[in-house]
UniProtKB/Swiss-Prot annotation:
Name recorded for this polypeptide: UPF0496 protein 4
Region (Disordered): 368-390
Transmembrane segments: 195-217
Primary subcellular site in the record, as a coarse category: membrane
Family: Belongs to the ROH1 family.
Keywords from the named record: Membrane, Transmembrane, Transmembrane helix
Compositionally biased region (Polar residues): 371-381
Family matches, as PANTHER family: BPS1-LIKE PROTEIN
Keyword Kinase in record: no
InterPro entries on file: ROH1-like
Topology relative to the membrane: Single-pass membrane protein
Any one of the GO CC terms: membrane
Subcellular location: Membrane
């Protein structure tokens, strides 16, 4: 049946989708429809921006900065929406106020915990900077003394990043509570109230999920991640559910190992720090081994001197014994023979150890020399010292590369932490400002009500 001539055309040619979104015959004006559609389109766009090309990118500080920027934008949008709705606080239901105030105060607590953890990690940069300063050398290669001085700072930094923040652990329960309380509240007799509740449901869902990612990554545990599924009746549901599925699966897989340092930039610095710590510890052990060898050598020399002195005493005793009795001379001779045997065995052992060491060194040089000859086709005498120089050179290059890598990684980590901390602080101020504005309007509304009661 054709439409009657002159009848008004529907704004939606295929029917009004808001009848599905708001069952029960609720009607929205065209202005409210446009406001809600604009808000939810922006929400869906932000969610699509947050979906990384690789799911593991959520473990980076750069993705976390992008996520905080999106949250700040969304919370600014909700404040603008409330203004555009022209819905005074005096018309708000008490339940709406309770929901907003309760969720906002918990969100502020989470922001404080995140800021505290970022500040703690940033303070650890002092230890890294000191270690890098100590390892700096005009010749390029740090000495064993420099490695020894840097080792305690590296160890202390690794202990610092290996500790789980108690505040972040408590955030897990808060996030689960917020996720459990998420629901689209039914609103009667207020089209503006329905739009407001729908918008608040969207922003709370996204905020809780993103914050759970932050807490999970910084704590190195998948437990804080919340399980949410947005119904299809919301225009941004597809973008949210796609992001949730991809990120949750990847984080659960990555964090199941229990590694505390889950942030990629932090892991890069930690890998370099551990390698430098091993090199510094090895250098210290080599120094202690050298000191021990010197002490053993000194002890052997003293034993040899005592043995020689005892031998002289035995000879004197032998002469005296010959002047008295032959029997005493025989006893002393046996003593001399025994002492001489012990001395010979001691010299033999020392000589044997030196010979073994020399044979091993010669064998090693011959083996390396053979390899050099095969590679170069030369029997030059200088080839004999190439293996030793190559080994030393490789160790120096490894050490310098490790220091260079840690310096670059530490600088990237510092900039990343500073930038993320600033963004979290800005987001905190946005949430706090919105909360304060609501409380201020509530006080004004209450005061106006009291004045009206007195006047009447």
């Amino acid at each position: 049946m054709s439409r009657a001539h002159g009848s008004p055309r529907s704004f939606f040619p295929v029917g009004n989708p808001f009848r599905v979104m708001f069952p029960g015959g609720a009607h929205l004006s065209r202005k409210l429809q446009e406001l809600l559609a604009s808000y939810e389109d922006a929400l869906a766009l932000s969610l699509r921006k947050l979906k990384p090309e690789a799911a593991s990118d959520v473990l980076t500080l750069s993705w976390m900065r992008l996520a905080v920027d999106c949250l700040s934008e969304l919370h600014t949008n909700i404040a603008n929406l409330i203004t555009d709705l022209e819905l005074p606080v005096s018309d708000w239901d008490d339940k709406w106020v309770d929901i907003y105030l309760n969720s906002s105060v918990k969100l502020l607590d989470i922001c404080i915990a995140l800021s505290s953890e970022l500040s703690r990690l940033d303070q650890g940069q002092l230890l890294l900077q000191y270690a890098l300063h100590v390892l700096g050398s005009e010749s390029g290669v740090p000495s064993q003394e420099q490695l020894k001085r840097a080792e305690p700072s590296l160890r202390e930094w690794m202990e610092l990043v290996g500790v789980r923040c108690a505040r972040l652990v408590s955030c897990s329960a808060t996030l689960q509570e917020l996720a459990g309380n998420l629901s689209l509240m039914k609103v009667k007799n207020s089209a503006k109230g329905k739009v407001l509740m729908r918008a608040l449901y969207g922003i709370e869902s996204v905020t809780v999920f993103v914050c759970s990612i932050f807490v999970a990554v910084l704590s190195g545990s998948p437990k804080p991640l919340v399980e949410l599924h947005v119904p299809e009746k919301f225009g941004w549901s597809q973008a949210f559910n796609d992001l949730h599925t991809a990120v949750s699966e990847e984080l659960t897989r990555q964090l199941s190992g229990g590694s505390v340092a889950a942030v990629k930039e932090l892991e890069e610095v930690e890998a370099c720090a551990r390698r430098l710590h091993v090199l510094a510890s090895t250098s210290q052990l080599e120094e202690e081994a050298a000191n021990l060898a010197n002490a053993v050598s000194h002890t052997e020399e003293e034993v040899m001197s005592d043995s020689i002195a005892q031998e002289g005493d035995h000879h004197c005793g032998l002469k005296l014994a010959d002047d008295t009795t032959r029997e005493g001379g025989i006893v002393i001779s046996e003593s001399i023979a025994e002492g001489g045997t012990q001395e010979a065995e001691m010299k033999k052992d020392i000589s044997y150890e030196k010979e073994v060491a020399m044979v091993e060194r010669i064998s090693y040089k011959e083996h390396q020399d053979s390899n050099v000859k095969q590679a170069n086709g030369s029997s030059d005498e200088s080839a004999l010292v190439v293996p030793e120089r190559t080994s030393v050179q490789e160790s120096k290059e490894e050490l310098l590369n490790c220091i260079s890598s840690m310096s670059k990684s530490a600088e990237g980590l510092r900039h990343g932490l500073d930038s993320l901390s600033k963004r979290v602080g800005d987001f905190f101020q946005i949430v706090l400002t919105g909360r304060d504005a609501l409380l201020c309007n509530l006080r004004i509304s209450d005061a106006a009500s009291k004045v009206a009661e007195v006047s009447s």
